[in-house]
């Protein structure tokens, strides 16, 4: 049983007499009343055991739409294969949004299967895949879950590309206009290095440790495409499904406006002092989850997002031309560019600053009114790009000839694969090949790990 606080206890006294003894008397205020009067939301301690997962609904929604665009998934065998394994790719978000994607819980530490679309978050990330246990001294500490990859996969989920580089154009624009020159690890490392002083200043202002801020989202997609192709050529439906299922997550990140922007958590040049503290916060603090989680959840509950998304996928006209893994990475750059054009990150941040102080019951509708329809559009485009990448990898690996379309891959087989850090290994930006025409399915881990023994 999971207990939640329901009141604020202000104090307790005991009244006593010689006949009936002492009787406790406490003064408490119902949390719902207090929060309503103070116009506040209940937020759990960020250091508490994480018993829920943010941000999975959108990824699963895009994954469920994978076989929908039949103008892109032209192979009947591929459509059959996808439909037969769809529940392993992505669960169906219900109206209550009560699907539970956690690997383990304190109540039941037995590892559970996680649908592939959110394995990159819910299994591989160290800040998600853990439970809190007590040590011999009774102190809480994190116990990592099976399959966790520390922070090695985190940079594959984002890429802050919308800052100027070598002139007035953003690095994203340069990648769109001349991918042969800029869409490679060396060029990206040079771009991030040029921003070191700026990144360091922002980190110092917010009291964070310095980091390289390396993002590698399109390169991860390139790698997964090549793994899918190799798996199809080898007649390996398990690896094909594992790689292609986790691919859903990264394509989903690419069509979320804030995942490829330096404004992902707010404008780092616009900060405030946290009330009652010396800590500095972004003025738009909370915008990422406010947009990607709360607004999307509101759309599902109140605006029939699932139905509208399915309709938009079918009616979409985006048809990226993809033959190789390099083409897939270029498609991701194009997807990011179109997404930010339709839903500019700056607009999201500005709107959030405008409405963040109002009640959640008013804030979510305000965000939806501002961005709901456009968000359905970019999610639908993401689903169509995902379908095009799947079809291209299937064709490149002769899936029609090599993969049994009727095979149903078991959850146990998929868990064995995604819990193995050597399968679709998560590597850093400087570990991706310089040659876009190389076989990126051959990427190996360079560092040893106890689990490799």
PLM regions with names:
Residues 240-248, 252-254:
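Short alpha-helix carrying the canonical HExxH Zn2+-binding catalytic motif
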Residues 59, 249, 386:
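Divalent metal-coordination and catalytic microenvironments
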Residues 6, 10-242, 260-380, 391-453:
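N-terminal, motif-rich segments that launch catalysis or mediate targeting to/interaction with membranes
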Residues 59, 254-255:
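Internal, helix-rich recognition cores of eukaryotic regulatory domains
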């Amino acid at each position: 049983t999971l207990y939640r606080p329901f009141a604020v206890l202000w104090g307790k006294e005991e009244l006593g007499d010689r006949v009936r003894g002492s009787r406790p008397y406490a003064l408490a205020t119902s949390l719902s009343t207090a929060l309503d009067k103070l116009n506040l939301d209940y937020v759990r301690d960020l250091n508490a055991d994480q018993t829920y997962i943010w941000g999975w609904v959108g990824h699963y929604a895009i994954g469920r739409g994978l076989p929908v665009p039949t103008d892109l998934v032209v192979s009947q065998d591929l459509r059959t294969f996808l439909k037969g394994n769809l529940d392993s790719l992505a669960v169906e978000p219900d109206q209550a949004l009560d699907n539970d994607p956690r690997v383990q819980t304190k109540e039941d530490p037995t590892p559970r299967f996680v649908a592939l679309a959110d394995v990159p978050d819910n299994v591989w990330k160290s800040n998600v895949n853990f439970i809190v246990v007590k040590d011999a001294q009774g102190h809480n500490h994190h116990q990592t879950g099976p399959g966790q990859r520390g922070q090695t996969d985190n940079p594959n989920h984002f890429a802050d590309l919308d800052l100027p580089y070598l002139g007035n154009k953003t690095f994203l624009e340069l990648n769109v206009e001349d991918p042969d020159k800029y869409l490679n690890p060396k060029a990206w490392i040079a771009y991030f290095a040029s921003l070191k002083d700026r990144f360091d200043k922002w980190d110092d202002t917010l009291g964070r440790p310095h980091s390289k801020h390396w993002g590698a989202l399109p390169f991860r997609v390139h790698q997964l495409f090549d793994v899918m192709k190799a798996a199809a050529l080898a007649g390996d439906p398990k690896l094909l499904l594992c790689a292609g299922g986790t691919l859903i997550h990264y394509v989903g990140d690419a069509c979320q406006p804030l995942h490829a922007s330096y404004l992902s958590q707010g404008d780092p040049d616009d900060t405030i002092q946290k009330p009652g503290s010396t800590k500095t916060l972004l003025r738009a603090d909370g915008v990422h989850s406010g947009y990607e989680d709360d607004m999307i959840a509101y759309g599902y509950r109140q605006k029939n997002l699932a139905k509208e998304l399915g309709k938009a996928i079918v009616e979409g006209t985006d048809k990226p031309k993809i033959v190789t893994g390099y083409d897939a990475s270029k498609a991701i750059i194009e997807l990011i560019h179109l997404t930010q054009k339709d839903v500019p990150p700056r607009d999201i941040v500005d709107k959030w600053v405008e409405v963040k102080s109002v009640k959640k019951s008013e804030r979510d509708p305000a965000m939806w009114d501002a961005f709901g329809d456009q968000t359905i559009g970019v999610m639908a485009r993401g689903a169509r790009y995902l379908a095009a990448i799947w079809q291209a990898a299937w064709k490149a690996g002769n899936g029609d000839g090599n993969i049994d379309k009727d095979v149903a891959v078991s959850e146990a087989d998929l868990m064995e694969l995604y819990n193995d850090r050597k399968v679709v290994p998560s590597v850093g930006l400087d570990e991706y090949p310089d040659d876009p025409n190389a076989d990126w399915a051959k990427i190996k881990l360079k560092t040893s790990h106890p689990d490799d023994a």
